[in-house]
Design a protein with these regions (language model features):
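Short, aromatic/His-centered strand-loop micro-motif at the edge of beta-sheets
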Residues: 136-156
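Short, solvent-exposed beta-strand-to-loop segments that form ligand-recognition rims
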Residues: 171-189
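Short carbohydrate-recognition loop motifs
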Residues: 56-77
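Secretory/extracellular carbohydrate-interaction modules
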Residues: 71-130
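Extracellular carbohydrate-recognition regions
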Residues: 26-49
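N-terminal secretory signal peptides and thylakoid transit peptides that target proteins
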Residues: 1-17
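Ligand-recognition surfaces built from glycine- and aromatic
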Residues: 185-211
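Short tryptophan-centered beta-strand motifs in secreted/extracellular beta-sheet-rich domains
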Residues: 93, 153-162, 166-168
């Protein structure tokens, strides 16, 4: 083999190695972002528990309409968005705790599959921001001390799942950073607890990979 041929093979091998290295560092999106402003009917949504519907809510981003959960006697209330399953994903939603004496919370459900899921939630009756997993019952994974979000005001929840790295934000503040790999993919949803009456608006789901 000539010296020129050896150099060509070496250059090609180096290029392939560089491309493989780049591919390992960057995950291609699974598909387009999903955005829900709740101006249309809830086609494709799946109610697991609770009483969910579209209502006029002050401060909603578009047309004054938001998704509201009104059941007050269930332990937990969950609704699943269309699409998925999602593995690595970034999710955000605006929520407004309207009322609740036992609880006044709002949360994002992610990697929901066969009734099991992760949850990040805030509660207007508690000075904490928490990450849980649910498998027949709820288990706390991580908690941050905060000033409880104000009742009757809009707030923003965000969660990012990258493999086993689960992170959470409240009103743009990074508060949770935890590792847990028991659930790898599933659907996205919204959550309330007990007697919480809560409005949700501007749900955004950004897939990071093919899940």
């Amino acid at each position: 083999m000539s010296e020129l041929s050896r150099r060509k093979i070496l250059a090609a091998t180096t290029l392939l190695g560089s491309c493989a290295s780049m591919a390992s560092r960057f995950a291609w999106p699974a598909g387009p972002d999903e955005r829900f402003d709740f101006t249309k009917l809830l086609d494709g949504w799946e109610i697991i528990s609770g009483t969910w519907g579209l209502e006029e809510v002050a401060g909603a981003a578009r047309d004054g309409r938001a998704l509201v959960q009104r059941a007050t006697s269930n332990k937990f209330n969950v609704i699943l968005a269309p699409g998925g399953p999602y593995g690595d994903v970034d999710v955000s939603v605006r929520f407004k705790p309207v009322s609740g004496s036992e609880d006044a919370s709002g949360g994002i459900v992610f990697r929901f599959s066969d009734g099991r899921y992760y949850l990040v939630r805030a509660n207007a009756t508690e000075d904490n921001f928490r990450l849980y997993y649910y498998d027949a019952r709820r288990y706390m994974l991580a908690s941050a001390s905060i000033m409880a979000p104000m009742l009757g005001e809009w707030h923003t929840l965000r969660v990012s799942a990258d493999g086993d790295n689960l992170r959470g934000w409240l009103n743009s503040r990074p508060l949770l950073n935890h590792r847990d790999g028991r659930f790898t993919a599933g659907r996205i949803g919204l959550w309330t607890k007990a007697d919480s009456i809560t409005a949700f608006d501007s749900l955004t789901i950004i897939p990071k990979d093919a899940g």
